[in-house]
Amino acid sequence: MKIWIDADGCPVVDLTIRLSRGYEVFLVCDTAHQFNRAGATTITIGQGHDAVDFAIVNRMAPGDIVVTQDYGLAALALARKGQAIDQNGRVFTNENIDFLLHTRHVGQEIRRAGGRTKGPKKRTRQEDASFEQSFSRLLTEKTD
């Protein structure tokens, strides 16, 4: 099992690496975001719409875990029989991904029509704790 991090804008890169001891961890980013972290291999992809997402999906295997806040990438990871988790500890499942994709679509339609939608709130320690708990549970389930 490998851990794939959609590293562009991911606030839990260091936390994920720390929790993933004993597993291969890959940070995938585009040329506008450079990462070099001990305990992880960095894969840099050329810039392009969804280039990082497709790079992860094309490299991952069934059973791998993807850390992403991108619902589209999460859906692709699930389709490849992987698991996906966001930076706040929400585990994406076949049961919740359709609703999340629909919510994203509605937000895009509102913005295209000139409307505004809420942006993300400031990150809290509780979100880090939630991520740590959920991610640790995923790792434990994989080793049982």
Swiss-Prot record:
Listed Pfam families: DUF188
Region of interest (Disordered), ranges: 110-144
Residues in coiled coil: none
Biased composition (Basic residues): 113-124
Top-level taxon of the source organism: Bacteria
Family from the record: Belongs to the UPF0178 family.
Protein name: UPF0178 protein Exig_1155
Species the sequence originates in: Exiguobacterium sibiricum (strain DSM 17290 / CCUG 55495 / CIP 109462 / JCM 13490 / 255-15)
